[in-house]
């Protein structure tokens, strides 16, 4: 799910190139497409967010967590890629209140490991680390200004 038709086309191209079958791509708002009773409401064994969370204003974290609660299967995994705060990171490190005073997200929000653990405290952390730096010749994507994280939902929820 992505708002961008270019992102959907790129993802479809990558999936086809990898020989992935049965992958469905949807263009639209992830919040609307996964609402209760909607076609994509889930549950899913894996939800992967690459670049959505760090572009949400602070007040949307509540609806984001509600989306995960609604769509992630018991024992399912949530993988996240987002801007890292601190040296070598990227994104705004302003406090939430200051973001509202300035009227913008400054290109995206940077998170510390502690902030991510606090936001996703209802999930079990499996791994949280900076991405490896992958060079331009690597077939893999990796930028050290990003966090990569894996969490698991409780099995009995």
What are these regions (language model features)?
Residues 1-42, 56-71, 76-157:
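Class I (Rossmann-like) S-adenosyl-L-methionine-dependent methyltransferase catalytic domain
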Residues 45:
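Conserved acidic residues
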Residues 48:
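A conserved beta-strand element that flanks and buttresses the S-adenosyl-L-methionine
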Residues 51-55:
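Short catalytic micro-motifs in class I SAM-dependent methyltransferases
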């Amino acid at each position: 799910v992505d708002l961008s038709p270019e992102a959907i086309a790129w993802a479809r191209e990558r999936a086809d190139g990898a020989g992935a079958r049965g992958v469905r791509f949807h263009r639209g708002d992830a919040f609307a497409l996964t609402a209760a009773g909607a076609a994509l409401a889930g549950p899913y064994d894996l939800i992967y967010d690459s670049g959505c969370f760090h572009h949400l204003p602070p007040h949307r974290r509540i609806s984001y967590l509600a989306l995960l609660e609604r769509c992630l299967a018991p024992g399912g995994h949530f993988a996240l890629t987002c801007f890292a705060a601190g040296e070598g990171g990227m994104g705004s490190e302003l406090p939430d209140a200051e973001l509202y005073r300035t009227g913008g997200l400054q290109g995206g929000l940077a998170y510390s490991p502690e902030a991510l653990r606090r936001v996703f405290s209802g999930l079990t952390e499996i791994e949280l680390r900076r991405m490896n730096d992958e060079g331009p010749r690597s077939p893999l994507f990796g930028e050290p200004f990003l966090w990569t994280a894996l969490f698991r939902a409780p099995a009995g929820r």
